[in-house]
Each structure stands twice: as C-alpha cells, then as structure tokens.
Amino acid sequence: MSKIVKVVGREIMDSRGNPTVEADVYLESGHMGRAAAPSGASTGSREALELRDGDTSRYLGKGVETAVANINGAIAEALSGIDAINQEAVDNIMLRLDGTDNKEKLGANAILAVSLAVAKAAALSKGIELYEHIANLNNTSGKYSMPLPMMNILNGGEHADNNVDIQEFMIQPVGAESFKEGLRMGAEVFHALKKVLQKRGLSTAVGDEGGFAPNLASNEEALQVIVEAVENAGYKMGSDITLALDCAASEFYRDGKYELSGEGKSFTAEEFADYLAELCDRYPIISIEDGLDESDWDGWKVLTEKLGSKVQLVGDDLFVTNTRILKEGIDKSIANSILIKFNQIGSLTETLAAIAMAREAGYSAVISHRSGETEDATIADLAVGTAAGQIKTGSLCRSDRVAKYNQLLRIEGDLNGQAPYRGRQEVNAG
C-alpha cells in the first residue's frame, strides 16, 4: 500500500519572490506527501545544481518549468510502483536517472522536492510523524533531541542591503531548559534589539531571513547592539545567551585577500583568523560559520589550529553537505562542524549520510534553512529525527522562518520530555 502511484511537480514562489519547485507524491494507500525545495543567496561553488530555465521573459530567467517538467515526466515514470518506505531505493533511482555529479540533468531542486515528498508520504502511510520516520531511516529510532537554535537577528552581507560585511549575527539561548523557553528568550531579545536600533535612529527593516539590517559602522558595532539588546531583555551574555557568526567569507574574498569593504579593511587569511579570534576574546562567540573562503584550505587549517579547540567552526560553502568533500576536510582536520542543507546535495539519503559521517568523526552537524524559503518545515523534523542538536532557521520574524520554529514547538509538545534540550552541550566548542 506504500507504492508510489503518482508524482506531480509544480512551480511555486519562495520567500524572496522567486520561483521554486514543489512536488506531491501519491501512494497506493491514498496518502500524499508534499515538499518544496529552498534556494540560497550565498551559494558554494560545489553545490548541486539548482536547475533554472534561463528564459529572461519569465521571472528574470529564474523560472523552474524545466525542473517541474522533469518531475512530471522522467521522475514520475521512474518512480511509479516503487515503495516509498524504501527512501534509499527511491533516491538512488533518481540519482541514476540524472547520472551527473552535480544533478545538472534533472536539477537538485527537482530531485530534492520529490525525495522529501516521498519521505512525508511514507510517514503518513505508516501512521507516524515525519521525525519518527527520519529517525528510522537514520537508524536512530527513539533517540531524539530538541535543537539549540541559532537565531539570525542581525543581517549583513548578501542577506541585506547595508554596509555590514559579516552575513549573519546570531544568538543562541544556551541557558534555556527547553526549546520552548529558548524560543521565548530569542523572541524577547529580538524585540529588545528593535528598540535599541530605534533609539539610535537606525532602520528596523529586515533582511531575507528576518533579522534586522541596519547600517552600522562595523561588524563590532553589530555585536555591541546585540549585547545591549540581550542585557535590556534581562539576560546575561555567555551564560543565558551566546553568539554565533556566519561570515560567508567567500562573498568578500578577492585575489587572496579578505576585503571588509564596509570597514575599509583588507586581511590575509592569517590576519582575518586573528581578527575573528579577537572578536571571540571580546564577545561570547562560540560558533563561526564559513570564517574563510571555501577554496582557502590552507587558511582554514590556520583558523582551525587557532580557534578549533574553543570555537565551533562550521563549514557551509566549505563542505556543501557533500560526503566526499567532508571526508577530505575530516582527513585534513579542517573545521569541526558541518552545516547541513538539503538542497546543497539534493536528496534526503545523501543528507543523512553527511550527518552520519560528521557524527562518526566527532564533528557537529547544524541543520539549516536557506535564505529563499517556503512554508515547508521539513528541516525541523530532520533536526529532531537525527538528534543533530542545532538548527539555523532565521530570525523570529517572517512566516517562512517561524514555520520551522512552530513545528519544533509542536514536536517538543508531542514528545513530552522524550527529546532533551541540551543547550551549549550541543556546540562543538571545546
């Protein structure tokens, strides 16, 4: 009764007003799973290919009708009669059908939407929650945890139109006793930050991920206004709330130098590693994502040696959720954590493999959204079902971000104490 009988793809809109792919998968039992692919702004060069039409007469060339046609044609035909409960078989059929290293034939957006929709349909057919089904696929049945959220409350870089070079300034409610309490703490700091910015006469417009995007003089000023907001909200920096950065350094890496144009500064890799280390000395920053360019592996070695024993160093563009690249990083002792994004690799099976490889090597795994999102909240179930321990899904604003937080609240309530919230223990920071 869990055999696939119909697969339907369609073009829908994401949170930035761009088209994306959605898929419905119908089973013999009558159950239907639906999922949508997200899309990134700052993307790693080695990510799986997001197939766009390139027809400038539609959506400025960003249409996804070709990817949708691949779902309604070749993918639907190949998956007809396949058991949805066997996720690996389903994904492998699509990978073989595509036959390329980066999924350029069918599109990672097409394959991913179907892959996740299959998982949702399978969970429904079994009468269980999606996080339970994911745990079964991950061989971690019953071993749940609620993730520590990294809340992106101040945006710069590619996520905002301002002069702040670091892309994301995040808070982590490490002192909370539950996800529900952590979410409340984050929301209170978010509202306190709005008041701090208003008092300074700064913009309270928000960026792609719901964080504020004011024009500030420097990256350090961004940290200063967050510290003020945390204290105004009645919390203590370091014990209640810690900080995390996403530098997205590939976006300001030019000709071997790290160019902070907002501050008029230029650094070598070693100098920028020192710059980050100094920030960590002055502020309770316990996680830094993409601190250096994705291709600057020599620089990453320096950064890891300098900070890796006390700060979580997360590879996003560096590893692109790819086990082959992650293994190379592990072998070379580069970074100590991986950001997990479904659409960087393009299927649920490959995503679970990356999480498993990281865990086996002692690397943490941070489940993540993209800047272009939809109401799809699958990453919430992924975080709980794999007990990854951390999630990054934007600010406490915009329904495309809050949808994931609300799903986590529901899951925590459903599990009623069976999924512990471990706070700072989840962070690979010495």
UniProtKB/Swiss-Prot annotation:
Gene name for this UniProt entry: eno
Cofactor(s) annotated in UniProt: Mg(2+)
Keyword Metal-binding annotated: yes
Cysteine pairings via disulfide bonds: none
GO CC term, one of those recorded: extracellular region
Annotated family: Belongs to the enolase family.
Organism listed in the record: Idiomarina loihiensis (strain ATCC BAA-735 / DSM 15497 / L2-TR)
Cofactor note (record): Binds a second Mg(2+) ion via substrate during catalysis.
Catalytic activity: (2R)-2-phosphoglycerate = phosphoenolpyruvate + H2O
This protein's name: Enolase
Pathway: Carbohydrate degradation; glycolysis; pyruvate from D-glyceraldehyde 3-phosphate: step 4/5
Positions annotated as active site in the UniProt record: 209, 341
Gene3D superfamilies xref list: Enolase-like C-terminal domain, Enolase-like, N-terminal domain
Keywords: Cytoplasm, Glycolysis, Lyase, Magnesium, Metal-binding, Secreted
Highest taxon listed in the record's lineage: Bacteria
Keyword flag rRNA processing: no
Function: Catalyzes the reversible conversion of 2-phosphoglycerate (2-PG) into phosphoenolpyruvate (PEP). It is essential for the degradation of carbohydrates via glycolysis.
Binding-site residues, (2R)-2-phosphoglycerate: 167, 341, 370-371, 392
EC numbers on record: 4.2.1.11
UniProt-recorded Gene Ontology molecular function terms: magnesium ion binding; phosphopyruvate hydratase activity
